[in-house]
Amino acid sequence: MTKGCFITVEGGEGAGKTSALDAIEEMLRENGLSVVRTREPGGIPIAEQIRSIILDVDHTRMDPRTEALLYAAARRQHLVEKVLPALEAGHVVLCDRFIDSSLAYQGYARGIGFEDILAINEFAIEGRYPDLTLLFRVDPDVGLSRIHRDQSREQNRLDQEALTFHQKVKEGYERIVETYPERVVEIDANQSFDQVVADAVRMIKQRLSL
């Protein structure tokens, strides 16, 4: 069976990734593709438990390196238990966040260092990078305003970080675009939701030749 395609969606808080993924998944299914939808951290029981530890609002004393290692551990288990089997079975895997989140959040915004976080995560993923990454670019103040207006959203520890932290996340993603131009495509998430989805769908169709 033909191997599948691994598509990840990245962006700062409030970029609208999760809502856009609903529309992207529907489009892919309408085109006759088998889709496995997942997220990081999470997607499987072990990783979901790690997620609850990482994002717990009461865990304010968590060391940045502890945080980075927990993300990498969740990523490894999620990759081998869910992502790789789905790809081998020929599915399109749509994942909300992957290695680039660690590079931007822990490597850049937390100040651990891009190269150190890259080393930790390359150990975890063993070279299995996404085939395509959609980076939803949104101004940090716009993104934070969105999440604070969303009454249905469960606030997590990252939501409580200062604006300066989220500005550093944005800078981290800018470096990622420069480092991996062959797989990372930028989407302007400051636009209307419909336009964001249209741009994302167009990019995916080009990559999958739909």
UniProtKB/Swiss-Prot annotation:
GO terms for molecular function: ATP binding; dTMP kinase activity. Disulfide bonds: none annotated. Keywords: ATP-binding, Kinase, Nucleotide biosynthesis, Nucleotide-binding, Transferase. One of its GO terms (cellular component) is cytosol. ATP binds at residues 11-18. The keyword Transferase applies. The keyword Methyltransferase does not apply. Belongs to the thymidylate kinase family. Phosphorylation of dTMP to form dTDP in both de novo and salvage pathways of dTTP synthesis. This is Thymidylate kinase. It comes from Halalkalibacterium halodurans (strain ATCC BAA-125 / DSM 18197 / FERM 7344 / JCM 9153 / C-125) (Bacillus halodurans).
